[in-house]
């Protein structure tokens, strides 16, 4: 923290040897827009009486962190809704070189010895599908989800259509 840094500089406190200095961290991000998009889905509960669960797909450009098109669906995470989200973004912004996803059934299954429908669809589009096995990908999607969830929670949507309108507003 800043206070710990000031105390260390003043010679009043010892630096915590167990922590690496922040300046030693290497930021992992692509250099150019459309080199890599990241797609991830997460469950969101509506503010209706049964607390209906929906799935929100968030698609983000890795270099710019621009939200390319978040969409909400009533079904659990699946390849069809993921491809719908991707197709809308590709129609608007063009194709990325690569798409990074988690290892969910809807996205990347090649490491299990088979290709998902989404992976085959991406290959037909000329897009490389990659899955995030390394720690360098951790946190980006989750941080974006956290910000989006706070935005939605503050507005307490009760319907899928209301969530989609809020997602469109969030992107603007």
Regions found by a protein language model. Give the residues of each.
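Basic, flexible linker segments flanking DNA-binding modules
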Residues: 1-39, 44-45, 116, 135
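An active-site-proximal beta-strand-loop segment
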Residues: 39-68, 76-79
């Amino acid at each position: 923290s800043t206070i710990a840094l000031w105390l260390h500089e003043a010679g009043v406190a010892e630096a915590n040897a167990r922590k690496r200095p922040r300046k030693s961290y290497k930021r992992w991000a692509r250099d150019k827009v459309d080199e890599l998009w990241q797609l991830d889905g997460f469950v969101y509960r509506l503010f209706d009486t049964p607390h209906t669960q929906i799935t929100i797909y968030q698609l983000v450009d890795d270099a710019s962190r621009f939200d390319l098109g978040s969409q909400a669906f009533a079904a659990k995470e699946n390849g069809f809704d993921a491809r719908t989200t991707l197709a809308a973004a590709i129609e608007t912004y063009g194709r990325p070189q690569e798409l990074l996803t988690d290892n969910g059934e809807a996205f990347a299954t090649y490491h299990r010895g088979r290709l998902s429908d989404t992976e085959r669809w991406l290959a037909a589009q000329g897009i490389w599908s990659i899955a995030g096995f390394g720690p360098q990908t951790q946190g980006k999607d989750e941080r974006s989800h956290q910000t989006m969830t706070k935005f939605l929670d503050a507005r307490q949507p009760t319907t899928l259509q209301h969530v989609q309108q809020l997602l469109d507003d969030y992107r603007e």
